[in-house]
Amino acid sequence: MTGRIERGISAVAASPSVVSIGFFDGVHRGHQAIITQAVRRASHHQVRSVVVTFDRHPMEVVAPGSQPWLLQTLARRVQTLAEHVDLVVVLPFDDDLRHLTAEAFVEYVLLGPLQAEAVVVGRNFRFGHRASGDLDTLTDLGKAHGFVAEGVDLLADDDGSAISSTEIRAAIGAGDVARAAELLGRPHAVDGIVVRGDQRGHDLGFPTANLQIDPRVAVPAPGVYATVFHHPDGRALPAASSVGTNPTFGGQELRVEAFLLDVDEDLYGLEACLDFRARVRDEVRYESVDDLLVQMRDDVRIVRRLLEA
């Protein structure tokens, strides 16, 4: 399934719907449980399944500068959501939307062309100005306006803690990409454009694709990782990737660089996706280039073994 994507309520054709609402950063396993229940309800009622999401993190508007790192770009998040439902509606989270009361939000979002018959959200769902509305508010408004509100219990991990975007960001920030993948239900990935670097990797015999990443998106802690480079032509290419500043050469700028194990071709200008499968080691400053080369060859052997396992 690949659903339609519309920007703004006014672009949506009128039709009954079962709706789920949220920012859904990362579209992790907890989000997927909510959306799956919405799809199940929509199928039962023979209406379309809809996700309503927002073009930016609410904190970017409510308290600029305090917003967290994102787990996905908007384009990637919307694409992921569209794989699950019939329609994704992207609302601009601006001052007008921010100041809507809970009831005004319901009237604007749910009672127009979406014609909501049911609304499925997580039990911690908040909405309306200053997050004044909760699941009980939504339930009461549903009774008044003719839709059913359903709260889905937060999905818990094996240790009993609720799966959350916050926990996933913490895992990524610590370089624990395996843990992040468990919580997401897939590897953490970053999208970027391949740009020219300083050519040092090429000179050393390890040409790398330097990815220009959206600075708002979370990247793992500095280190070397086993990764898969998703070429826009559909190929999934094994890669040893580094996140860091190249301290051996006195670098300062954080970079994401991928050495493709079995491919050496011109990648400049391509839009690619890099997913992180396993952490290999920390970033280290080496005393000599020869020491670095020995380590890089070892890194490649380890990455190949990890990706073939």
Language-model segments: what does each one mean?
Residues 60-145:
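N-terminal Rossmann-like or analogous alpha/beta NTP/dinucleotide-binding catalytic cores
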Residues 11-68, 73:
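N-terminal catalytic cores of NTP/NDP-binding nucleotidyl/phosphoryl-transfer enzymes
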